[in-house]
Amino acid sequence: MKVTCMMIVAVLFLTAWTFVTADDSISALEDLFAKAHDKMENSEASPLNERDCRALGEYCGLPYVHNSRCCSQLCGFICVPESP
């Protein structure tokens, strides 16, 4: 019983200590999201915009739709153009 009470008091103390000594995390997250949004407005800031894809007629592997290896995302052992 005494050990349980001591554990509860210790957990409460450590929880309170964490909240008292923590930085203002809400404003820190807001700043982080604002910075991320500013970077995304500049399209050249994102390395995801540069795709390394294969041109039409190049080997792409197993045939399936939405193949990220092909710029057209259509693979039939070779990259094929999208149908209109």
UniProtKB/Swiss-Prot annotation:
- Which tissues is it found in, per the record? Expressed by the venom duct.
Q: Which domain of life is it from?
A: Eukaryota
Q: Does the keyword Transmembrane apply?
A: no
**Where does it localize?**
Secreted
Q: Which GO terms describe its molecular function?
A: calcium channel regulator activity; ion channel inhibitor activity; toxin activity
- Its predominant location is secreted
InterPro entries, per the entry: Conotoxin, Conotoxin_omega-typ_CS
Pfam families, sorted: Conotoxin
Gene Ontology CC annotation, any one: host cell presynaptic membrane
Kindly give the PROSITE patterns that the UniProt entry links to this protein.
OMEGA_CONOTOXIN
Mark which residues the record calls propeptide: 23-51
Record-annotated disulphide pairs: 53-71, 60-75, 70-79
Q: Give the record's keywords alphabetically.
A: Calcium channel impairing toxin, Disulfide bond, Ion channel impairing toxin, Knottin, Neurotoxin, Presynaptic neurotoxin, Secreted, Signal, Toxin, Voltage-gated calcium channel impairing toxin
Q: Where does the UniProt annotation place the signal sequence? A: 1-22
Q: Which family does it belong to?
A: Belongs to the conotoxin O1 superfamily.
The domain comment in this protein's record states: The presence of a 'disulfide through disulfide knot' structurally defines this protein as a knottin.
Please give the function described in this protein's UniProt entry.
Omega-conotoxins act at presynaptic membranes, they bind and block voltage-gated calcium channels (Cav).
The identity of this protein, by name, is: Omega-conotoxin-like ArMKLT1-02
Q: Which organism is it from?
A: Conus arenatus
